[in-house]
From Swiss-Prot:
Pfam (any one): Toxin_GhoT_OrtT
Organism of this sequence: Escherichia coli (strain K12)
Entry's Gene Ontology cellular component terms: cell pole; membrane; plasma membrane
Annotated protein name in UniProt: Toxin GhoT
InterPro entries in the record: Toxin_GhoT/OrtT
Impact when changing residue 21 to R: Protein remains toxic
Variant or mutagenesis effect after changing residue 38 to R: Not toxic, protein still targeted to cell pole. No change in intracellular ATP levels, no dissipation of the membrane potential
Amino acid sequence: MALFSKILIFYVIGVNISFVIIWFISHEKTHIRLLSAFLVGITWPMSLPVALLFSLF
């Protein structure tokens, strides 16, 4: 398995985990929850830690 494939699998797993986390953290309407979970999911290396910090306050 090439390095690119391993990185891609790691990224997809991170997308799925962050999508689920943000889906349960947000308390908006369903379509807004879906949009926010999707956007945080695809940019999870930078935005997931920020979203988790904001959810603490």
